[in-house]
Every structure is written in structure tokens, then in C-alpha cells.
Amino acid sequence: ITGLDGKYYLMFALDMEGSCRLGLASTSDFATFKFLGIVSGEDNRNGVLFPEKINGKYLRMDRPNRVQKEGGPLSSSSIWLSESDDLIEWRGRSALIEGRFHYWDEFIGSGPPPVKTHEGWLHIYHGVATHFQSSNIYQAGVMLLGLDDPSRVIGRCRGNILEPRE
């Protein structure tokens, strides 16, 4: 859920037959919602909007699903950045960060909307370690993106900031 332009926008995964797309809805009161449409043209999930326009464009991070592990769902190991004039049609997609093989964040995806700080956009993302004998362990990490150019990764935590212990 992202507050933007006086409304709240919800970007969500639409599980469809054989694939997953990103859907977008808006609300101003959380009692009624308006479905705005399907906003991804390919198998995709973990979409999150930036809470303000940057250089006159709406920005979103998402995770195209391109990898299928044996017996598992289609997933991916990268977070992408794209831009839009209207929140519906998206273009200019490019990889922002990649998962790290045999590390806590082999498969990754965005978390909540990024937070604007004086140093840049702080973004929490999730990672999945898949190399623990088929026991997927979800963890959280953090990265900092350029304030005026979020395609620039200023820093990314080497270790996780949150993980389950039991």
C-alpha cells in the first residue's frame, strides 16, 4: 500500500492460470476500492510503488518471474525498476539488484514501499535461502537507492537484518 497523490494505491499479485501478474487498485477511504487494471505484461510479482514521482515519473520495483525450481513455483532472483506516466503502462525496465547464489538472498523480491531519507531511498526487501536442503528460509535485507536516481544502488546490506530463529 502506497500513499501517492492524495490516494492510496495497492499493488498486488494476481494469480492467474499458469502465471501471475501485477494488479493495481486505489482507495481514498479503505471502504471502497477501484480496480485500475493489470499493470504487468509478463509473469511478475512483488510490485511496489515509490511514494512520490521522481523526475516527473511514477516508479515501481517488481520481480519478473523467470526461474522455476523443480516442483516449486516460478520465481526469480532479481528486482527490477520501471517507470510510468499514468501508473498503468510501464516501460524502461532494468535490473536493480540480483540475488546472490548460496547466500541468504538467493531469490529476492521487494518489501514495503521505499522510505525517503536525506541519504537516499531506503528499501527493505526479502530474500530466500534455497540451499538448506529444500527448506526455504525467508529473511529481510535492506538497500539504499539514489534519491534523484533510484536506479543507482548506493549500498546493500551484506547480511540480513531479520531472520526466523524457530
Labelled PLM ranges:
Residues 2-48, 52-106, 115-166:
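Beta-rich carbohydrate-recognition and catalytic domains
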